[in-house]
Design a protein with these regions (language model features):
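Phosphate-binding/switch region of NTP-binding enzymes
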Residues: 35-37, 62, 181-239
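Conserved inter-motif catalytic segment of the P-loop NTP-binding fold
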Residues: 71-172
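Amphipathic alpha-helical transducer elements in NTP-driven molecular machines
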Residues: 28-31, 85, 135-142, 178-182, ...
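Hydrophobic, well-ordered secondary-structure scaffolds
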Residues: 136, 154-206
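The Walker A/P-loop phosphate-binding site
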Residues: 2-98
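Active-site proximal loops enriched in glycine and acidic residues that flank catalytic Cys/His/Asp
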Residues: 50-52, 62-63, 79-82, 128, ...
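Acidic, glycine-rich A-domain
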Residues: 126-127, 175-176, 224
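Conserved catalytic network of the ASCE P-loop NTPase/AAA+ motor domain
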Residues: 39-41, 69-71, 117-119, 147-152, ...
Length: 239
């Protein structure tokens, strides 16, 4: 039976830190407009959804860049929605320099590529399948994030873009699958002090009859419905 009583003596130091910090354990996300509404939990999760082209990927990466620049956090990226390894690295370079990749007078140069290598390779680890023919599940990625360590230390965050690109062993109702897998994720984040950020696309978003614009999606619009809301106790962001 997979049950145990948690011994306070094993948790004493963690709880004392929890008390001193007011129970927060969160970092400023880097957006003044979100201050007091959204913070980056070191042992939490963030799920991002939004209409097509609303900037979900850009928003997520901006948060991660700020966490690296200010707090020194490291991130594992699994992002087929961005594209190939080269396309992901290009996006990281553009964010690092805040300049165009090429084609303009002030575009990133060959020397810039070299100068940024150490920083990007330290804080952003681009992940891919070891065997393209084999499935990769979200649990595989979360477990790998918790187990990975190199000369620069552990990885603090797993960024998935997007949920649809992973293998999901549903075998029945999708909401029941999500209840299981998201509960696993939440417990793992707290246990291992990691942050799991996921981009999940809505199934479809109708146009508002009055504004003639797409309605802002919520958790019910993602495949699996309200399980996303109940499965994300820390942070849910929609655009």
């Amino acid at each position: 039976m997979n049950v145990k009583i948690i011994d306070y003596n094993a948790k004493r130091k963690d709880f004392e830190v929890f008390h001193k910090t007011g129970g927060a354990g969160m970092n400023y996300a880097g957006f003044e407009c979100l201050n007091g509404v959204f913070q980056f939990a070191l042992d939490g999760v963030t799920d991002i959804t939004g209409t097509p082209g609303s900037g979900k990927t850009e928003f997520g990466l901006e948060i991660l860049f700020y966490q690296s620049e200010v707090f020194g956090l490291r991130h594992l990226l699994y992002a087929p929605d961005i594209g190939s390894y080269n396309e992901i690295r290009r996006k990281l370079l553009v964010k690092y320099y805040r300049r165009s990749f090429r084609g303009y007078e002030n575009s990133i140069t060959d020397l810039d590529l070299i100068n940024a290598t150490a920083w990007i390779d330290t804080y952003f680890l681009i992940a891919g399948k070891e065997d393209a023919k084999k499935p990769l599940s979200p649990i595989d990625l979360w477990n790998f994030t918790c187990e990975y360590e190199d000369k620069n230390g552990i990885v603090n965050t797993c960024f998935i873009d997007s949920w649809k690109n992973l293998y999901h062993d549903i075998q029945g109702r999708e909401d029941q699958y999500l209840d299981y897998v998201l509960s696993y994720r939440n417990e793992l984040a707290e246990l291992k002090q990691r942050h799991f950020m996921t981009i999940a696309h809505p199934k479809n978003v109708e146009f508002d009859k009055d504004t003639k614009k797409r309605r802002i999606p919520d958790a019910n619009d993602i495949s699996g419905g309200a399980s996303w809301m109940t499965g994300s106790p820390r942070s849910s962001v929609r655009q």
